[in-house]
Amino acid sequence: MTLASCDSRKTAGENPFFTEWDTSHGVPPFDKILPEHFMPAFERGMSLHEAEIDAITSNKDEATFENTILAYDDAGQMLAQTELVFGMLCAAETNDRMQALQEQAMPLLAAHRDKIRLDDKLFVRVKEVYD
């Protein structure tokens, strides 16, 4: 464990979720991802996702497939990417730290998803497109 913490490639200050991945085929840079990177990435991802949803719901233009449905589908990419990597690592390399992170993150992520899915303004816009 001590050796891993001295590895200059694996420092908590360089959160790989906050940079574009320059890896082959865009795969996650697993050698640079540490457990302490996830909560800040989840928090930023949720914040960005909320801002993207707010942009959809506050759009004064008539609701269309493009500015509502496609925008909703495109929203939350950073959060989705972080959740995907987190899920893969929890399944493949679980340990006490990752399990503790799951216990901490899952209620926050569930509440975030509920907030988005139950957003009255978003529902109205989607219904306008449907009607």
Language-model-detected regions and their locations in the chain:
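Hydrophobic h-region of N-terminal signal peptides that target proteins for export
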Residues: M1-S5
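Zn2+-dependent metallopeptidase catalytic domains
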Residues: C6-D131
